[in-house]
Amino acid sequence: MKDEMEKIRELVEALLEKMGCPASANLIEYPENIFFSVHTKDGGILIGEDGERLRALNHVVHKITDKLFPETKDSLKFFIDVNDYQKQKIEEIKDMARLSAQRVRYFKKEIEMQPMSSYERRIIHATLTEYPDIATESTGEGRERRVVIRPL
């Protein structure tokens, strides 16, 4: 898998070059995530409003790597992060999940969160496993899928 990650790093750098935002991508491995960290003065251009362009860049790179490495496409889990945007977003989601769990505990009522991506929902589910008196469940369909946090 190390070889694939190096090729993906090179792909990310080549795409950034073609987009007119040359930058180096550093591979950073955490226990739960693999990031290609990109730092550039053109970060706002790559991130876009609410991370929209960054999500699109991640989507394109994943589609390309699915074609390049069809035998390992399900095991290649990674994200491209520009100027630590994703890292900060993950921390915000974890904080929001913990705050919501505290509210559920206090008021003994379920909370339905706003719609979010499957990745963001997974962060919430994983974060709240540390609360044995709280249950989480994803409900809804498509872009309206959200997490419901309820007391046990």
Kindly label every feature range from the protein language model.
Residues 1-152:
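RNA-contacting regions in translation and RNA-metabolism proteins
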